[in-house]
A protein has these predicted regions:
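Glycine-rich phosphate/pyrophosphate-handling loop used in enzymes and phosphotransfer proteins
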Residues: 1-283
């Protein structure tokens, strides 16, 4: 058996002495399929799983994904290192003082580091779409910190159609669905509205990873549009993405929403990559 691609397509090669109808082959086939769908080792640390059937990440790894509780920029949510906090003016980072983002406020659950980063990579590049439900719970914690009304519209940062076809899904959409599902079920946010196609990306762009701050802004400038402006007029919009680095993509989305008449745009991400914390990498 070979597992091909992030969608885990299974290709079986039968040995010459095996018959597909033999009990031994069927037993091995079932076992192989079960191991592929329900791994026996944690996806992140490799330790043997001892939880209920179908678990994929061990309890210790989930527990290690803690929220950021330190000081951060009041506008964009950039985490401050202890030496940096005293230099902040009016609780704003240098970037927000020089060039205010288009969104009203941005918050992230945690730093893009450690097991949170690994879980996002498993979701994004290895087809572990089922992780979005649990990660949506983490997003819900960040959402509740915003103290927003439950009548907001939740929308994902869109992928271009070609990128979505290549990947098979939009990870931001999966996370946004997980967030709304959790808030409705556990927090009784019945008025929260999820709209998957609120925004569209009008052209393909280069990946943001590796680009400078100015190049990131230029790369996504004018890329997003609102399909039906009447849906956002005078509404509060919560934008969801997996990782926020400079905020260029979320700011470009917010600009399109504000042009369409949105009264308030909040940016919510699962993790924040920050140069002040080298281990957090880039999104």
């Amino acid at each position: 058996m070979r597992i091909l691609g992030s969608k885990a397509r299974l290709v079986f090669s039968l040995p010459g002495n095996y018959k597909a109808s033999s009990p031994s082959f069927l037993s091995e086939l079932i076992g192989t399929l079960f191991a592929a769908v329900f791994p026996t080792d944690c996806l992140l640390c490799g330790r043997e799983l001892t939880g209920p059937g179908g678990a994929s990440i061990c309890h210790a790894c989930w527990e290690s994904m803690q929220p950021w509780l330190g000081l951060s920029c009041e506008r964009c949510g950039l985490p401050f290192a202890s030496s940096q906090a005293s230099d902040a003016i009016d609780s704003l980072c240098g970037s927000c003082r020089l060039d205010e983002p288009e969104f009203d406020v941005a918050r992230s659950y945690g730093l893009y580091t450690g097991n949170l980063r690994k879980a996002i990579l498993q979701l994004k590049f290895h087809g572990r779409e089922f992780l979005a439900n649990r990660l949506g719970e983490f997003l819900a914690q960040a959402f509740k910190a915003l103290s927003e009304p439950d009548s907001a519209i939740v929308a994902p940062v869109p992928l271009h159609a070609s990128r979505r076809r290549q990947r098979g899904f939009n990870q931001a959409e999966l996370l946004a669905r997980g967030l709304v599902r959790w808030l409705r079920r556990k927090e009784r946010f019945e008025g929260l509205q999820f709209v998957a196609d609120l925004l569209r990306r009008t052209r393909a762009t280069l990946p943001q990873v590796g680009l400078s701050v100015s190049a990131r802004r230029q790369n996504v400038s004018g890329v997003f549009s609102v399909a039906r402006p009447e849906r956002v007029r005078n509404r509060t919009i919560v934008l969801v993405d997996d990782v926020m680095t400079t905020g260029a993509t979320l700011s470009a989305c917010a600009a399109a929403l504000k042009r369409a008449g949105a009264s308030r745009v909040l940016a919510l991400s699962l993790a924040r990559a920050s140069p002040q914390f080298p281990d957090s990498g880039t999104g």
